[in-house]
Amino acid sequence: MKPRTFNRRIVAISSLYRWASEPSRCSVTGVPRNPMPPRSLLHAPKTTRGLSEEQYAALLACISGRRESDPKAQRDYVLIKGSYLLGCRVSEIAAIRWGDIESLDDGGQVHLLGKGGKARTVRISGDTLALFERLGRGENCSFVFPSPRTGGHHTRQAIGDVCRKWGRAAGFHVHPHQLRHSHATHAVQRGVDVFTLQAPLVTRQARLLGMTWPQILW
């Protein structure tokens, strides 16, 4: 159980005992005092905050400006912008194969393999499809972001290194999960309702959302 989940449950239980042990109720509830010990909460790390839209734009501009001098910049640009546009987990973007990216009449769709091996499909705009295809489409079974050392896909650690590298170059801290937070935050700020937002972020089935949201974020 994660610390935040544990803390929420402890607070809920403590609140119930505190309510039941109030002088006006304790004779009825039979709870003379709150039995929960003080300072029983676990330390929880600070919640991840997304990038501002200005920071996100500056990050992409920083990568774009170095495409000629850094041979990996084009791949990194697609990796970072693609992660943001899909709103996916780092493990999902790492494992994408070319066969998972499909072209449709009105854009495309990407099949992702999420937590617990649960598959989901996210609709994308034509611009997002073109972004990935800048890398040069490979065989269906080959990874979009292959590791040059192992022949498999990029690891979580390698993608984290890419984000940190360009974050330092842009002048602020960046890590992969921050892109997922930024995706959700910016979508809500631009008027996407929360229920629509849930589909590409957490749903297990394909959702046909149309092109409104991908075009908003693009």
Where are these regions (language model features)?
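Conserved tyrosine-mediated DNA breakage-rejoining catalytic core shared by Y-recombinases
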Residues: 91, 95-131
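Short, polar N-cap/turn motifs at the start of nucleic acid-interacting alpha helices
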Residues: 101-103, 172-173, 192-218
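Short, charged phosphate-coordinating catalytic segments
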Residues: 24-27, 83-106, 195-196
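Basic, Lys/Arg- and aromatic-enriched nucleic-acid-binding interface segment
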Residues: 57-90
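Active-site/catalytic core of tyrosine-dependent DNA strand-transfer enzymes
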Residues: 125-173
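N-terminal core-binding DNA-recognition domain of tyrosine recombinases/integrases
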Residues: 1-46, 62-68
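DNA breakage-rejoining catalytic core of tyrosine-based enzymes
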Residues: 42-60, 117-126, 139-142, 157
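Short basic/aromatic active-site micro-motif
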Residues: 74-75, 172-191
